[in-house]
Swiss-Prot record:
Gene Ontology MF term list: argininosuccinate lyase activity
InterPro entries attached to this UniProt entry: Arg_succ_lyase_C, Argininosuccinate_lyase, Fumarase/histidase_N, Fumarate_lyase_CS, Fumarate_lyase_fam, Fumarate_lyase_N, L-Aspartase-like
Keyword NADP: no
SUPFAM superfamilies: L-aspartase-like
Catalytic activity: 2-(N(omega)-L-arginino)succinate = fumarate + L-arginine
Protein name: Argininosuccinate lyase
A Pfam family of this chain: ASL_C2
Pathway the protein acts in: Amino-acid biosynthesis; L-arginine biosynthesis; L-arginine from L-ornithine and carbamoyl phosphate: step 3/3
Similarity section: Belongs to the lyase 1 family. Argininosuccinate lyase subfamily.
Length: 458
């Protein structure tokens, strides 16, 4: 079958060559954006007097009909026409006749596809920003319920200091806030129109790029036609932002996986987000958390792949750039799916507060309180650290915890220890005394929650 661009050629490609070069099996996801961009383009051609008004109206009616069919999932695509752009153009010509061939006046597939991807990604980034906001709401609500629930805080996955469980949850609220900010900031750079840049050098037609930009909701245009069609940094930035977001989700998933194990038993996943074993009847596996953790690697891979594709390309467009889409589409699907699943896991998980709090009393995570106790009485912190370290060793040798040591043992270590040391060792006291800004003290956590509420809804 003759190609729409086939005038210069004397031979047709073999089917297997067409199959290798075609992108329609994945770029059909741009169908709505492609038609929307074409409607704006032909509207501009009419406003600028480049096409007769009657032709413009005929083309717009044909495109509108195709858009309605696309939204209903009624369009069928062919590898013969390679990509979404030529498929739509062929459908338009079939729908309204040869006048449909005028649509591409003053436009190249190079600026067309760049426009499609800007429109597509803008919609998805806005959706992702809202999903992050919704996840933050879930975390803040859960944190409000557990301000005075204690949990061991860890470094090196070793118990370090007791903290408020709400404080732990709020740490992720702030991480996700930075993720949300990154996506929002990327929108400002992304929301520029490449339409009208042509293949690379602009066009001889008296087009109005600012008009099409306004019609499509862009804030402005790419100021350089070569830049407009040559770069995919807006996709790379999206993949980078997605990678950081997925890293945060993956870290939290790792904790949920650990906490739901028999070794921790801090939480239990809702049945909705767990699976069983085909051989072991007792198993309840945190598969959804594991999948998010695993899918993070896919997103990283897409980022590295596109960076690698782009790193050696001379300006302007090269067919290598066709490889920008599948990773983008997959990342969009992965991020949106992960955010929805993760919010559901947090919302429905059972939190075993008794197990968490018991864990804060069966370790040496209150040792820092002893060192601080001595430091506040004038002992150099390094000396206090040494004294408390030896007391911990004494406990280990006796098989007890710090709160179990009699006062005379403390006073043998330092005469500055008094009866009030036992109150300092109480995990609730230890947590609540950490009132420095951003600390785990209950009053500070409450402040953080209120601040986060305002931030999320701003």
């Amino acid at each position: 079958m003759k190609k729409l661009w086939g005038g210069r050629f004397t031979k047709t490609a073999a089917q297997w060559v067409d199959d290798f070069g075609a992108s329609i099996h994945f770029d059909q996801q741009l169908v709505e954006e492609d038609i929307e961009g074409s409607i704006a383009h032909v509207t501009m051609l009419g406003e600028c007097g480049i096409l007769p008004k009657e032709d413009v109206e005929t083309i717009k009616k044909g495109l509108t009909k195709l858009l309605e069919k696309a939204k209903r999932g009624e369009l069928s695509f062919s590898v013969t026409y390679e990509d979404i752009h030529l498929n739509i153009e062929k459908m338009l010509i079939d729908e309204i006749g040869p006048v449909g061939g005028k649509l591409h006046t003053g436009r190249s597939r190079n600026d067309q596809v760049a426009t499609d991807m800007h429109l597509y990604l803008r919609k998805r980034v806005i959706e992702i920003i809202e999903l992050i906001r919704q996840l933050q709401r879930v975390l803040v609500e859960k944190a409000e319920q557990h301000i005075e629930t204690l949990i061991p805080g860890y470094t090196h996955l070793q118990r370090a200091q007791p903290i408020s469980f709400a404080h732990h949850l709020m740490a992720y609220v702030w991480m996700f806030e930075r993720d949300r900010e990154r996506f929002a900031e990327s929108l400002k750079r992304m929301n520029k129109s490449p339409l009208g840049a042509g293949a690379l050098a602009g066009t001889t037609f008296p087009i109005d790029r600012h008009l099409t930009a306004r019609l499509l909701g862009f804030d402005g245009i790419y100021e350089n036609s070569l830049d407009a069609v040559s770069d995919r940094d807006f996709i790379i930035e999206f993949l980078s932002n997605s990678s950081i977001l997925m890293m945060h989700l993956s870290r939290f998933c790792e904790e949920l996986i650990l906490w739901s194990s028999q070794e921790f038993q801090f939480i239990e996943m809702d049945d909705t987000f767990a699976t069983g074993s085909s051989i072991m009847p007792q198993k309840k596996n945190p598969d959804m958390a594991e999948l998010i953790r695993g899918k993070t690697g896919r997103v990283y891979g897409h980022l590295m792949a596109l960076l690698t594709v782009m790193k050696g390309l001379p300006l302007a467009y090269n067919k290598d750039m066709q490889e920008d889409k599948e990773g983008m589409f997959d990342t969009v699907q992965t991020v949106i799916g992960s955010l929805n699943i993760f919010a559901g896991m947090i919302e429905t998980m059972t939190i075993r507060t008794d197990v968490m709090e018991k864990a804060t009393k069966q370790d040496f995570s209150n040792a820092t309180e002893l060192a601080d106790y001595l430091a506040k009485k004038g002992v150099p912190f390094r000396e206090a650290h040494e004294i408390v370290g030896k007391l911990v060793l004494t406990c280990i040798e006796r098989g007890v915890f710090l709160a179990d040591l009699p006062l005379h043992v403390y006073q043998q270590a330092s005469p500055l220890f008094e009866e009030d040391i036992y109150e300092a060792l109480n995990p609730y006291t230890a947590v609540n005394r950490r009132t420095s800004a951003g600390g785990t003290g209950f009053t500070e956590v409450k402040k953080a929650i209120e601040k986060a509420k305002q931030m999320i809804e701003a």
